């Protein structure tokens, strides 16, 4: 019972952290894509690649890449920074891997919603003297809240149901998915595993119905139809440069982790 309770708390904690981080990073990517005029076309192509990678690759790829790059015998940790006691296992490792895996889903969901916000509403606020930050906090963000909640729940469900990443990089951090597996293969307790599976299934189904029949309707009611005019992109460098640099670095890092996997076979 104690093991189940620990696994349940760990699973909820992991889902909450991953959901918040994935939604936040996905929102930043969507905002840059929709509101900022990207100076270089390759940045836009990089964003498109990042959005497709989680769809076409196995879910455990980033865990494997993280171990190869930053583990105790990692290419970067050992051969570049000469760190021989690097520990990527546990909650922090799973959070990083799941966030990098799932935030593109939030990015794609929120990108479509941002495009449907009528720019005339935001421009009217700007015309009466509201700052760019105030427009975002008082107009854009409130309109996006149902969509952000939707993206958060989808990511939460993905995180809770994920088995491969916690199994590879979780270490002694048990989740419901890994505990159920070990209950069957290690303890040969199929009855206990079935009971835990019912709890996990119930949790994901409850979240799914909230996302499907409550938040999805709110999102549709908030953002309907098409924008009445073309959105003028943000040109203020104090806004565009930090956001673009952050998103480009994150996207390049994700692509690097996928690209480096074949090279991992060359190192012991």
Q: What spans do the regions from the language model cover?
A:
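Membrane-water interface segments at the C-terminal ends of transmembrane alpha-helices
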Residues: 1-115, 143-163, 195-212, 238-267
């Amino acid at each position: 019972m104690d093991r189940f309770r620990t696994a349940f708390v760990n699973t909820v904690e992991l889902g909450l952290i991953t959901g918040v981080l994935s939604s936040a990073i996905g929102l930043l990517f969507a905002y840059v894509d929709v509101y900022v005029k990207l100076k270089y076309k390759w940045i836009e192509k990089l964003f498109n690649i990042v959005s497709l990678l989680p769809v076409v690759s196995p879910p455990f790829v980033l865990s494997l890449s993280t171990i190869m790059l930053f583990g105790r015998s990692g290419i970067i940790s050992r051969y570049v920074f000469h760190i021989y006691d690097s520990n990527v296992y546990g909650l922090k490792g799973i959070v990083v891997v799941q966030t990098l895996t799932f935030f593109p889903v939030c990015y794609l969901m929120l990108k479509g919603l941002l495009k449907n916000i009528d720019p005339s509403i935001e421009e009217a606020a700007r015309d009466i003297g509201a700052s760019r930050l105030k427009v975002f906090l008082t107009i854009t963000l409130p309109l996006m809240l149902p969509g952000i909640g939707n993206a958060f729940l989808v990511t939460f469900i993905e995180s809770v149901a994920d088995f491969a990443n916690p199994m590879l990089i979780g270490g002694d951090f048990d989740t419901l998915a890994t505990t159920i597996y070990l209950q069957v293969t290690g303890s040969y307790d199929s009855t206990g595993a079935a009971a835990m599976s019912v709890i996990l299934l119930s949790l994901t189904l409850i979240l799914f119905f909230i996302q499907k029949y409550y938040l999805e309707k709110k999102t549709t009611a908030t953002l309907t139809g098409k924008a009445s005019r073309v959105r003028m992109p943000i040109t203020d460098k104090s806004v565009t440069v930090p956001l673009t640099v952050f998103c480009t670095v994150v996207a390049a890092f994700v692509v690097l982790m996928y690209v480096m996997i074949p090279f991992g076979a060359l190192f012991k």
